[in-house]
Amino acid sequence: MSKILFCKSKVFLHPTSDARDNIAGFLLLTLEANKLSHQAILQYIPESGLSTLEISKLLKHEAKVGTCPTSTPFVIENSINFSNLVNTSLGQAFEISLSQIYCIQFRPPSPNGWYVGSLVIYPLTEQFTGFQPPVLFFHDQLCPSTTDKLKRLRKSMNPFDDSDELYWGGVDLRNKINELMELKKSNLEPEFWLVNPSLNDLRNFVSKDLLESYNNSKKDTTELATAGVKLNEKFQEWKWNVMSKIADVTTKSTNFIDSWLTNNSPIQKSQIDNEYLQKLLNNEKVKQIEQDYDSARVYLANWSLGVKQEAERYQKQNKLFDSYRNNIFNDLNLTDELSDTEINNALQRQFPLTEAKWNSLWDENDGRLRVTVNEVKDFIFHGGLENDSLRGKVWGFLLEIYPWDSSQDERVQIDQTLAAEYDQLKLTWSKDFLQFDDEDEEEYWNDQLFRISKDVRRCDRNLEIFQYNTIDGLPPPPQQLPANENNSTSPESANDESDDADDGVRNPHLIHLQNILITYNVYNTNLGYVQGMTDLLSPIYVIMKEEWKTFWCFTHFMDIMERNFLRDQSGIHEQMLTLVELVQLMLPELSEHLNKCDSGNLFFCFRMLLVWFKREFEMEDIMHIWENFWTFYYSSQFQLFFMLAILQKNSQAILQHLNQFDQILKFFNELNGKLDWNDLMVRAELLFKKFEKMMHVMERDLQNVSSSSSSSSTGVLPCQSERLTLLLSKKPIIRHEGQRSKNSVK
């Protein structure tokens, strides 16, 4: 039994040039019961193989689903055996699964009616060697569903479909396939649409690099009409280039101002002979500017960075790919170190992993992954995940709840086991089971509960699900709101109870967070609860929703992050030392300048690394950043390269404007909400590739030195640094807290 998803009549085969030989038929999309959408079958059945009753039934289905919106439910067909029809249609019929199609060429009809629209199907060669489905021709003037829609469009004075293309019968099929699985238009040949493309297909055939040549090929009589728009785009591009240059000039000009103000101290002013200059320097306004110059430095640094970021953001949003590429190329000082492929792969981040694509990666029989894990991670790292619904499925794999090689049945068993284990862990801290051997343990436990409750009440209260501390999580009635609750931007002040209130947490989602953290305290008794864990837990809960699943994702995340929270701080200290060495190698000028500013230890980076930039970005951005990190696509410590990208991005502002520790600390503290995570991820990837090549070159040089008996090594090459070498590893660094004792400092 199959479901008819799409039906189009009067689709013809043209076996000869004689129109009398044309073969009329039906083009169908069907789906067997209990099959996934990407397993839908595209079928062509000639009318000659159908009875009058069957033709009548199909025409009724065409009226229902041929041009219906996506919300229309599937119609189940019981009386037509499609496979039998295909097999008995004398070789004129065919069927092919959508998952077996590489691409489809949709050739629209001639506007003047000289030829009809058609489509050409290109199967995957490894699955259909020697088989080429015939070209299908859409005789729209004979098809009832197409003519009906054309009448409606003409009546509305709009002959175009939703994508602003001239409507014809093939558009309906294309839209329906796009509902079922990923369908991407090629900029190289606009008539070609890739079906469920791989990431390499997207890079090769839907590349932004092709945008300019594609636009040039589209020039026609509309060129004059679009000239004004293009001129405006050119002006906008020029404007942002100029603004970016102004920021650079301002950066350089402050060198003169800095020198001038430094050399004109009160003692030196008396030595200046110029009467006018003396009068100017004695002016009260000038003195005030001089006294406020430290804060002005931070302002100038932020301003120049802001202009630069706005210019880059405009270039990306308006497809000015070459300009953005050149900016990155110059900023990172890339010469011939990286190949064009490496640079393009880093820059092309516009292809997220979609739900349809994700579903197509799994075997329909046992639910096992059909592609390599690296291919999936490539999609995630370079494009992210399409939406939160998909994150709820994928994060379980990234956080190792589910093995990548598991089957669907095995994952169901894992869910049942982990849910039961979580319930057992929760029981251990319930009032009926909780007992203490001594007063110290009881005091420690109560202190942990207090800390958890206190931090949970402060956790991401700007998010809707955590905003109101009410029993149902909804806004309280207006009469119950304090006077200052009219300001919805500060729900904490209106809804929070005092820190020592026993029933302070009422919001059901906050209660779930509290339960998870208390259970983790039992699960990892040596570490317990440490401030900052709520920052790590909140995004996972927002996605997973279920308490038990959130808990296990969090525990696996904490396996990676536990070294950041060790009591002796050795884990985070080791990362800071690694970052210092990395900056010395990759950004030597910045490293030297920071040392002069007493900031060479990079203390201002501490908080960012501690909770993986949670405080610097919005929730949606953090989800993108973390799922990139969790892939370990290049390195298990890729967060250090992301931090390196932040330093590199701001290096010119620091070098030219800031020269004191407190200025630098203030500057980085004010970066919250000002950073572009996507741009930083591009820079981080290119910096890693550059670092990787540098390490390989230095390792080769070191081997050459070692093999030469006449050579003697002086100093230590960077590749001999264990910390830097470890950055090339994809294996997570796991460090656990030691045994907790009564004397442990919490």
Curated annotation (Swiss-Prot):
Site note Arginine finger, residues: R458
Signal sequence range: none
Gene3D superfamilies with a match to the protein in the record: putative rabgap domain of human tbc1 domain family member 14 like domains, Ypt/Rab-GAP domain of gyp1p, domain 3
Keyword Nucleotidyltransferase: no
Keyword Membrane: no
Rab-GAP TBC domain sequence ranges: 385-633
Gene Ontology CC terms: cytoplasm; cytosol; late endosome
Phosphoserine: residues bearing it: S265, S339
Gene Ontology biological process terms from the UniProt entry: regulation of vacuole fusion, non-autophagic; vesicle-mediated transport
PROSITE patterns for this protein: TBC_RABGAP
Annotated keywords: Cytoplasm, GTPase activation, Phosphoprotein
Entry's localization field: Cytoplasm
Bias kind Polar residues: ranges: 481-491
Residue ranges of the region described as Disordered: 470-505
Effect of R458 to A/K: Completely abolishes catalytic activity
InterPro entries attached to this UniProt entry: Rab-GAP-TBC_dom, Rab-GAP_TBC_sf
GO molecular function, one term: GTPase activator activity
Reported function: GTPase-activating protein (GAP) that most effectively accelerates the intrinsic GTPase activity of Ypt/Rab-type GTPase YPT7 involved in vacuole docking and fusion. It is also active, but to a lesser extent, on YPT31, YPT32, YPT1, YPT6 and SEC4. Provides a catalytic arginine (arginine finger) in trans to accelerate the GTP hydrolysis rate of the substrate GTPase.
Other information: Present with 2460 molecules/cell in log phase SD medium.
Protein name: GTPase-activating protein GYP7
Species assigned in the record: Saccharomyces cerevisiae (strain ATCC 204508 / S288c)
Gene encoding the protein: GYP7
